[in-house]
Swiss-Prot record:
One of its GO terms (molecular function) is ATP binding. Belongs to the RecF family. GO terms for biological process: DNA replication; DNA synthesis involved in DNA repair; double-strand break repair; SOS response. The RecF protein is involved in DNA metabolism; it is required for DNA replication and normal SOS inducibility. RecF binds preferentially to single-stranded, linear DNA. It also seems to bind ATP. PROSITE patterns: RECF_1, RECF_2. HAMAP family: RecF. ATP binds at residues 30-37. Keywords: ATP-binding, Cytoplasm, DNA damage, DNA repair, DNA replication, DNA-binding, Nucleotide-binding, SOS response. This is DNA replication and repair protein RecF. It is found in: Cytoplasm. The lineage of its organism: Bacteria, Pseudomonadati, Pseudomonadota, Gammaproteobacteria, Enterobacterales. One of its GO terms (cellular component) is cytoplasm. The gene is recF. It comes from Photorhabdus laumondii subsp. laumondii (strain DSM 15139 / CIP 105565 / TT01).
């Protein structure tokens, strides 16, 4: 499905906006601080229940207001009816999800209905940040590929939290075994899903990287979070004293990673900023295209500050690849000259200024 209409109320510096959207490219043009990134943030929040810029709800609510409200209309594909989704959140962080006019929906339902890929200047953490960012990349794919993944992941987090708390109190492994008896099968199952997903998507990533960065030989390897030759049950028992001293579980799926190297060297040590951005875009595009091929559902792409770190030829390469996906794309830019050659009959340009958003006529 595509997002055909977006309503925003009291979000960041946007008091009210009602945006009719193109099914292709949607360009948001304005100066720094105008609110163009806030539109991307609103779309992301509608599909995730949280912002990509702040974990505190109060920071995204317009000053002097009690809550923000977001609403989207999803256009139908073949044999599908039009859908509506809504999200409101107050300063205490309490959320209300509405789907097709009915309250009581879940954030996970929004994520299923509005799958998206986000590319921002801060997104370099996917490549040079800690393992949690690359786990999130893998888990996005598992969430959309395996219906049982989300509940297993939630239970894993719960059990790890309980186990870590218990490590502060127990003196013998037998006292913590009840948690491990639940944790071990979940850990093995999640590890299997993650490993299979990385195996399945690696060729897509490799092919996209060859187009974007043909000068490098890149490798991608899944690290499961413990010695792959070790049985996880035996490892937990063997490392009990160490875990008890640390007061947390040192090994497991919560330590998994995706190792990305160029010519055998970590990419953050080999690639320039512009090359890292292209690699980040390649990963997001490959994941979105793999998702579409597997599910038959399109993925949205959100690109903040499109031109940053990229010269003209690289911008053109990225724009051409995005167009080839035939997906809905939202792009922010400071200068309209950076995106005018991307405008066509299936796109719209919005001028954003001080939280006010207007559709711009196309010549």
């Amino acid at each position: 499905m595509t997002l055909t209409r977006l309503l925003i109320r009291d979000f960041r510096n946007i008091a009210a906006a009602d945006l009719p959207l193109a099914t292709g490219f949607n360009f948001l043009v304005g100066s720094n601080g105008s609110g163009k990134t806030s539109v991307l943030e609103a779309i992301y929040t509608l599909g995730h229940g949280r912002s990509f810029r702040s974990i505190q709800a109060g920071r995204v609510i317009l000053h002097g207001c009690d809550e923000f409200v977001l609403h989207g209309r999803l256009g139908q594909q073949e044999n599908e009816r039009e859908r509506s989704i809504g999200l409101s959140k107050n300063r205490n962080g309490d959320s209300k999800v509405r789907i097709d006019g009915s309250d009581g929906g879940k954030i996970a339902e929004l994520a299923k209905m509005l799958p998206m890929q986000l590319i921002t200047p801060e997104g370099f953490t996917l490549l040079n940040g800690g393992p949690k960012y690359r786990r999130a990349f893998i888990d996005w794919g598992c969430f959309h590929n395996e219906p049982r993944f989300f509940s297993a992941w939630v239970n894993l987090k719960r059990l790890l939290k309980q186990r870590n708390a218990a490590l502060r109190q127990v003196t013998r492994y037998s006292q913590i075994r009840p948690w491990d008896q639940e944790l071990i099968p979940l850990a093995n199952q999640i590890n299997q899903w993650r490993g299979e997903y990385v195996t399945n998507i690696t060729q897509d990533i490799t092919n996209t990287c060859k187009q974007f960065l043909p000068e490098f030989t890149l490798s991608f390897s899944f690290q499961q979070g413990w010695d792959k030759e070790s049985d996880y049950a035996e490892l937990l028992e063997r490392q009990f004293e160490r875990d008890r001293t640390l007061t947390y579980t040192a090994s497991g799926p919560h330590k998994a990673d995706l190792r990305i190297r160029a010519e055998g060297t970590p990419v953050e040590d080999m690639l320039s900023r512009g090359q890292l951005k292209l690699l980040m875009c390649a990963l997001r595009l490959a994941q979105g295209e793999y998702f579409t091929r597997q599910s038959g559902q399109q993925c949205l792409y959100l690109l903040d500050d499109f031109a940053s770190e990229l010269d003209t030829s690289r911008r053109q390469l990225l724009a051409a690849r995005l167009k080839s996906t035939q997906a809905q794309v939202f792009v922010s830019a400071i200068n309209p000259d950076q995106i005018t050659d991307m405008l066509d009959g299936n796109s719209k340009m919005f001028r954003v200024e001080n939280g006010k958003i207007e559709v711009q006529p196309q010549d």
